Structure formats: C-alpha cells, structure tokens
Amino acid sequence: MALPKRSPRLRPDREERRRVARLLNELGMAALVPEDDFSRDVGASVLERAILSRADVDLVFVSVESWGIATEFGQFHTDPRIASKLRVLVDPEHHPLHDPRDGYLKDLYLPHLAAYGHVYAVDGGRMVRVPSKESLVLLMAERYRQLKRSQPNLIR
C-alpha cells in the first residue's frame, strides 16, 4: 500500500501519513510514505509509477489537495496497472456527489467514481450534501455510458 504525497503547503500531513503508515505496519500491512521510502536519485514521477504499478501493491491512497496531486491522480487514473488500486480522498467541496457545482475537479473524479467506485469525501466533522438515490443513479449511469463510449479501456 502506498500513501502518495499531499501538497507541500500542508506539511503536518506528512506526519499524518507517517502515523497512518505506522498503524498499517502494526497491522501487518506494508505501507510506504514517498518522502521516506522512495529514492531521491530517481524522479518521483518515474519511481512512483514503477512502484505503484507492481502486482504486490494492492491499494494506493491519494489525497488530492493541490493541482500537482490532481495531476498525479489524473496520470494514475489513466494507467490501468494503477487505476483499480486507487482510493481517492477529497474534500467534500470537491466530491462529485456532495457538491452541486460543476468544475474541473468534479469532472476529474466522476469518471474514476463511475469506473471504479473509489472516491471518498473526507474531513471529519463537516456536514455534506447527500444525493438522492435517483440523482446518484442517473449521474453514475450517464458518466458510465460516456466512459464506455469514449474510454472503454477504463471499464472492466
């Protein structure tokens, strides 16, 4: 399991990732924190992709809190060796089911949610909008249809 980087402006989250990695390691799961576990001699974009696409990596958690991480998510989402492992953690304001506004991030997350079902709103304590069953089914079915037509390789 790998826990990719968050925005550099959010340095306290490095400690959070380390804490989560320690907890996972205590449960017998191998967890990686890129800043601690990846070589600095090779570019992060090359090394992350090589490591995350390995068969022995089961899950990849990405917490999208900057455009850099959003770009990284976009690259991982289009890589079939990584996409099904991705678990995307987003602020409720950017989750496609909890924010009625359209925008780039919502449009980026919705195909992943439709194809793989793993985009989670996180940030304890906030109240978020919950879609009706009807609107959820219509939203997901339409995006799935769009993906099936335009990017059938994403649908497994």
PLM-predicted stretches and their roles:
Residues M1-R156:
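Conserved catalytic or regulatory cores that recognize and/or transform ribose-phosphate-containing ligands
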